[in-house]
């Protein structure tokens, strides 16, 4: 053994987050990958991939990147600028206790937060069961037949309820009535949604101002935003007499004590499950809900989990009735909903599973008792409570003392709600302590102790709940934390998420969600801030939002951003409204034509329809590019009424089109604006800026490019960036600037997940973000090169390159071997992979996006699996495998297959351990291939009875 003669310092940087943590391939691996593709350097590959005309001139620079520790210290310093007071503001946002077992094993568990929307049901059985629990919970509490698997927030759910009411109502009226006791943000968003569609909104007292003949529907708040509790049974009956639809916005915790909307006759119930264990988080994310009568289930927006069977007849879950949705029906869809709030819906469902009906009822009773005690103290001080009966919210007339009392309460560490100029409101919740009540009494001039008052109740006797809820055994069998932990673990083990393997979904950007980025979302300085606190209590949030806005402007070339949209589809909608408002301000409100290529995301035409625009479809040429002849012809044909075009860049076919600047110029020439969908921004950051190539507005999917996890189908964020001339038309909000145009319940959308994107930017720096883009392009081109010969890559640039994703053609296998794209996708499950995006944008193909976070080893494992699948298809072609009884047709294979009677013409080894599959750590699909047709024909969208669990297995 030799003895070193001197100590030599290494140049290895162990805390280089971009290159040592986030980016998968090492420098030596990149060199090997480049050789396979045929390039000597990464920069030469990038030069060959991006047209010179779209390259940005200056590098992305904003200071040195931070280490994980430095970034966390910066986040902590920023978080400490927020003041965490006790907020009794209410208005749809309430203090809640997240059970630690749920925080630790779901919210902070990558097995749950890194999963994708469960389009592949076989590898999503765990979260599908959790979502079915959620739907069952909502159906039980609302007294309605079918509930969806979550919506974005209560205000957007109300707007969706209005839109659904208009679709299904027999009334031909074009007005919608809104209870003045709805939350202000709900009223604002309903107005935003109604105006482009030509519907008028009537706001008033439903008992004096509602004439059912004049409306296609009405929405009532239950309990009201100021605490009133009314029985709407009579009003709902009157609405039904005229063919109108009744929507009730209901607090699910209150429904454990109060008569359900279904028992009143409501057609639709909407609301938010935030107070079921999900922190307020300065406005989100939270899971809203919608439940409807059975007759209207096919008109309901959003994801719907149903019960089906697999190939063995065993019970299996899947997304049902997908033909309602934007990815299939486009502008004719029930909604533009894409991202929902799955992670938060799972948390809320587990809150109900953990507490059970007795626990939920006890929590509700305790909340109500606190409100009664608060009222008694204020009454003893001589104040009058506006409501005789209430659940958790009271409103007090204080006259000219309003400002003094509000300031005194803040000095006591409590935020109360300003109601008009002479009233104060307060909403009690699960976290309200005796000290809080005593502090509020002091702010009102009293010096009472809680023991001075006797508990009581002030719920309306005629509206007390008598019906049962949460009767299914799942809500009774997991009270002990040991059992709860094991139940959550069992469900997560059924799913395939990023913590197990790469998820190469094209156009979805399933990249690393680093632990250091995730940590701050649980800090109380971020999670416990009410969205409507005074600005000086959220200075940390504002500082972070301002800095992130500045960074996103630098990345995109835009001049302003709105963080309000809480999904990519909402970003599209907000961007199109911004364009619409710009035209109206210029006296050109007649401009309503939106040009959209056939290859666009389904959300594009759905969003355009919601924004009151008419969609004109543009052809796509054989090479995947926009057909310029058709584009020119349509732009000229509709020039007088052209509002905008919507394009995705790089294209949805995975190529940087060289005509993008010409497209932008052509639209501007005819008076329109350019909406560039930011879904594929992961191929542009640091290399090209939408604002430089002629785009006027884009949304960015922070849950793609900027590392917010997909959460199994949400949360997401879709902030929009605009050029300067559109900035004044960005969404407003009643609680901030008072301007119209709100598109989300909270002014900054799902603000509590913004620390993820901000810390990603801080740790990567401009240079790291640029390198990430380059490696994303490298990884996609490497896969395309590795699969060459086995599969055709459908679309390439003139230089033979793809962008950050590639489309491989599996259609020839149908004719040669009877192998469909479904067969390939299900066989990948046996290999331990989530399938790439199937049949979009081209039917019968797979779109692969590996992202920059995947190592060469993982890319090689995926390629080995895909090549092995091609060889299995070849064996069928050559007659060496049976055409109908083979590993592809029978995939995925389960443990039940392995241990059961085996009479197949291939071995168990071939079935269960194909190339790419791990042996020791193999992922086993919990079910065989799910029967989609059975699930839609025999629709069951709530937990099946226990007996059926056994029946399905027979």
Swiss-Prot record:
InterPro entries: GcvP, GDC-P_C, GDC-P_N, GDC_P, PyrdxlP-dep_Trfase, PyrdxlP-dep_Trfase_major, PyrdxlP-dep_Trfase_small. It catalyses: N(6)-[(R)-lipoyl]-L-lysyl-[glycine-cleavage complex H protein] + glycine + H(+) = N(6)-[(R)-S(8)-aminomethyldihydrolipoyl]-L-lysyl-[glycine-cleavage complex H protein] + CO2. The modification N6-(pyridoxal phosphate)lysine is found at residue 704. Its EC number is 1.4.4.2. One of its GO terms (molecular function) is glycine dehydrogenase (decarboxylating) activity. GO terms for biological process: glycine decarboxylation via glycine cleavage system. Keywords: Oxidoreductase, Pyridoxal phosphate. Its cofactor is pyridoxal 5'-phosphate. GO terms for cellular component: cytosol; glycine cleavage complex. Belongs to the GcvP family. The glycine cleavage system catalyzes the degradation of glycine. The P protein binds the alpha-amino group of glycine through its pyridoxal phosphate cofactor; CO(2) is released and the remaining methylamine moiety is then transferred to the lipoamide cofactor of the H protein. The glycine cleavage system is composed of four proteins: P, T, L and H. HAMAP family: GcvP. This is Glycine dehydrogenase (decarboxylating). It comes from Rhizobium rhizogenes (strain K84 / ATCC BAA-868). The lineage of its organism: Bacteria, Pseudomonadati, Pseudomonadota, Alphaproteobacteria, Hyphomicrobiales. The gene is gcvP.
